[in-house]
Amino acid sequence: MGKLDETMFFDFGDNKQNDVRETLKTVYDALEEKGYNPIDQIVGYLISGDPAYIPRLNDARNLIRKHQRDEIIEELVRYYLSEQIADSKKEEN
């Protein structure tokens, strides 16, 4: 069997995760700069889907709308759980 007969695998997951992380950082900074509580505003957006929770400052509103809300939630859960697992392993040692 030649190399051309083998199934190729393409995974763009890490790039998408990094993109979501960068977007969340930008949105968080924009919300802080405007004087809003970033956590409350991001949660409001994720629950409602209403982009009015996110300011236009630094193009934050357009950036967050590039991602599906479920993708953002998935990344937040992934990050939270990985931190919790890492912390519990530190406590075991």
UniProtKB/Swiss-Prot annotation:
<dbReference type="Pfam" id="PF06135">
    <property type="entry name" value="IreB"/>
</dbReference>
<protein>
    <recommendedName>
        <fullName>UPF0297 protein PEPE_1262</fullName>
    </recommendedName>
</protein>
<comment type="similarity">
    <text>Belongs to the UPF0297 family.</text>
</comment>
<dbReference type="InterPro" id="IPR009309">
    <property type="entry name" value="IreB"/>
</dbReference>
